[in-house]
Amino acid sequence: EGRANTVRSRNARLAAIKAFFRFLEPRRPACLEQAMMIRSLPVKRTDAKLIDYLTKDEVRALLAAPDGRAPAGLRDRAMLHLAYAAGLRASELLAVRMDDFPRGSFANIRVLGKGRRERVLPLWKETQAAIRAWLAVRPNDVGPELFLNRDGRPLTRDGFAYRLRQHVAVAERATPSIADKHVTPHVLRHSCA
């Protein structure tokens, strides 16, 4: 208590100590009683922190932020539209491949999610248009991933987060309230829900 550690830190340390005593139990039977006492210590409860989300105006400003005249801007606009409209995790978004659109239509997208669960999601007309605009300028002689960096390789999670930060800075000019929020790919996902 005197160290002013957060509840999360205390729980992490307690978990490490409990794991150590689980390791000790079969090796040192003399410590069994003490190990059982330590393993029975409860973890501290914490309040679940609410995840930020964007208002409709903030989302509109963010979706309009990428420069629609440049290939990177068209890619970013398609990424942001798809992330928001489908509520995708960053890993799901960056794993989207050209063949994830059933029958070549952009009305639906097949997503392989957490736990290798596959789901098919409908896409809004604006999202479909953004994807078509990106595909019109996307290089054809590269990998199957939908979103590529400027070298033609699949865009990374850090690359997406970097581009998102840049577009949030642009969106702040149109909607200053977005500056008060820590916008991450996960916040974009929660804004959809």
Task: Indicate where each model-derived feature is located.
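Conserved catalytic core of the tyrosine transesterase superfamily
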Residues: E1-C192
